[in-house]
């Protein structure tokens, strides 16, 4: 009789449905893998406010939560929104629940992470809508708009093309992007204990995805 696998649990707050769909897809992919040493449980809420998410959690002991958030643009409104999110993650440490918030940001958006599963996406974009062409190329699709791509049925059609190997490819491509940013002399911004680049592409969502795969013996 096969040995029963232990379950690793991960906590998230995300800003949109696509991020949640992705995390549940990854959970199911790992849990169906014979190679995985552990099962995965994902506690993920669509919640733009990290502080509200933390306050509503019923937990005991030290807990790590990852907030997946988009940089959106360098417009002052979006930059302020981004920094307000960081402030809330910092404040979540002070509510007496022993919560540590980690930041899985994407610049511009989570769609960059989806593209990296299939192809490189190293060039800077002037607008989020410019992800549509590489998305269509990566997934051999003909989505008419970003909203069309994010329709639940269409987004899952992209996920269904992916494997653990594609996730590992995305991690490696993301690491190369961040290394290139450093080599290009971009300034790593520091704000309330969190780091990020103003320049796109840049992203840190790969850190928690890599950790999940490592914890399950898949990397």
Identify the role of each PLM range.
Residues 1-7, 20-40, 52-59, 63-64, ...:
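C-terminal accessory helical subdomains adjacent to catalytic cores in phosphodiester-
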Residues 11-21:
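Catalytic nucleophile-elbow at a beta strand-turn-alpha helix junction centered on a G-D-S/GDSL motif
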Residues 41-48:
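Acidic-and-aromatic substrate-binding clefts and catalytic sites of carbohydrate-active enzymes
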């Amino acid at each position: 009789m096969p040995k029963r696998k232990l379950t690793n649990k991960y906590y998230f707050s995300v800003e949109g449905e696509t991020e949640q769909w992705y995390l549940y897809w990854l959970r199911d992919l790992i849990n169906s893998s014979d190679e995985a040493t552990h099962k995965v449980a994902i506690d993920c809420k669509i919640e733009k406010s990290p502080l509200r998410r933390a306050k509503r959690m019923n937990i005991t002991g030290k807990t790590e939560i990852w907030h997946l958030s988009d940089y959106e643009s360098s417009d002052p409104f979006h930059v302020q929104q981004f920094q307000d999110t960081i402030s809330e993650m910092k404040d979540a440490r002070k509510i007496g629940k022993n919560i540590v918030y980690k930041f899985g940001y994407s610049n511009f958006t989570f769609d960059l992470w989806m593209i990296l599963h299939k192809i490189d996406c190293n060039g800077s974009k002037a607008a989020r809508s410019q992800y549509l062409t590489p998305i269509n190329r990566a997934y051999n699709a003909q989505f008419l708009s970003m909203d069309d791509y994010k329709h639940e049925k269409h987004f899952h059609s992209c996920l269904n093309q992916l494997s653990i190997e594609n996730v590992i490819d995305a991690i490696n491509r993301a690491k190369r992007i961040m290394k290139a940013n450093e080599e290009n002399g971009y300034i790593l911004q520091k704000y309330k204990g969190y780091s990020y680049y103003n320049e796109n592409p840049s992203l840190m969502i790969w850190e928690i995805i890599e950790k999940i795969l490592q914890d399950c013996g898949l990397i």
